[in-house]
């Protein structure tokens, strides 16, 4: 699940913090990097559990209405299509998700007010109403309902962002990327797999894990060389006056460009320009792009960089 976009973001955060804290312990910082990445995977599982919790909340409401002193006919014989959603039933018994919940002791029980509010939004939505009014019923429709609900109601949800931020500082910048993986997980679900449906693994393969470790270490261990290159290509600037975050981003970008021959230069440049837009000043993207482009051209002229 953890892809290189997320890895780059985390390395920028950890390298910046490493220098702010005096740059003393590389091993400790590396452990912090991988702990931070593991927290992103926890968030992925936690957001999958949220869909189950909302369904449970809807079911509680149906049962409460049935047990009223004088329930209406509709309350006695409600439409149970939503609470009997086959995709959610499969997700609820998923072995990997149950293992996460049991091991991490993570549930939504302490966020009951938020779950109720989210349930209200879902039950009031046109997506829900169209689904409930449909006379057809299939696993595919059940799964598609939750893809739509997640994309339109959970994906950009300010209240949820606040809940997650209060629970873990590691999740501040993760949700937007993790949301895309939750949507992928929903699409991947197949009824015939039952409780054994595989969720996305934490790392796709060892290569991505190695990428994280190597990029982080090269960034720190070769810092003097990378900063020399930056200084040489910003002669009209006092490097001490360049935003420190810009220096960190360029340092990591150079580590990637010079250490990973299979990653095209254009890919690295684009990725770090986008990161600059998130973490630095409004003009940082253009400044970083221009500086790195100048460094790349100089290295190519000196035959110190041969890839495109």
Model-derived regions: residue spans:
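Class I Rossmann-like S-adenosyl-L-methionine
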Residues: 1-308
